[in-house]
Amino acid sequence: MCIRDSSESEPIIDFIDNNKIDLKYILNTHHHHDHIGGNLELKKKYNCDVIGFKDDKNRIPGINILVENNQIWQKGNFEAKIYHTPGHTSGHIAFHFFKEKIIFTGDTLFSLGCGRIFEGTYEQMFNSLKIFKKLPKDTLIYCGHEYTLKNSEFCLFNDPDNLKLKEKVLKIKNNHKLNSPTIPSVLDDELECNIFLKAEDIKTFSKLRDLKDNF
């Protein structure tokens, strides 16, 4: 088994031990503490490998497998293409399990949103989002945080005539009432409803990102 971004160890340990799972790999999308906080304890307990971007080798605790842009990482039954997606952080990556049509986008792409820009530039984030737009439309997107409801409100505020978005917002609100997750999302929906993916140029994207920071 592999896990993505071990924010903390205790709930992961409980799940692994209760289900008698053999943890082999931790996949880290970036170095922020809420994504790597459980690395060292999990590695110590299960002797698992920690995978991350080569330029973050001094920022990801326990890292022992370094990957780079466009590399195919393959171990056993696991096979993923690595995309370097800077913007949120300089060393951010995404893991695309292309056979399963699943991508772990970390804090670069959220459902109906994108990550804040901390270490990178608007242009880097804009170009990183372009990578996802080229994937098969039925790709399932597993992001680093479930900000879907708040993101949907921002998208609807800026794209009020989008009928597909209105339908999606209703589903999101219903999911929240039922305490059901909104993740994963489907790329096809994101292409139609996520205003950051719909931005056609860097100027439009930058304006939207600034507006979202203060929404």
Which sequence ranges carry the predicted segments?
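Short, small-residue-biased leader/transition segments that mark boundaries at the very start
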Residues: 1-3
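Divalent metal-coordination and catalytic microenvironments
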Residues: 5, 30, 42, 67, ...
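Active-site metal-binding loops of divalent metal-dependent hydrolases
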Residues: 6-8, 31, 55-56, 88-89, ...
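Active-site HxH/HxHxD metal-binding segment of metal-dependent hydrolases
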Residues: 8-81, 168-172
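Residue-level marker for buried hydrophobic side chains located in beta-strands
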Residues: 27, 102-104, 142
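Core dinuclear metal-dependent hydrolase active-site scaffold
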Residues: 72-98, 102-103, 134
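Active-site-adjacent loop/tail segments of enzyme domains
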Residues: 113-138
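Accessory terminal helices/loops
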Residues: 130-140, 149-215
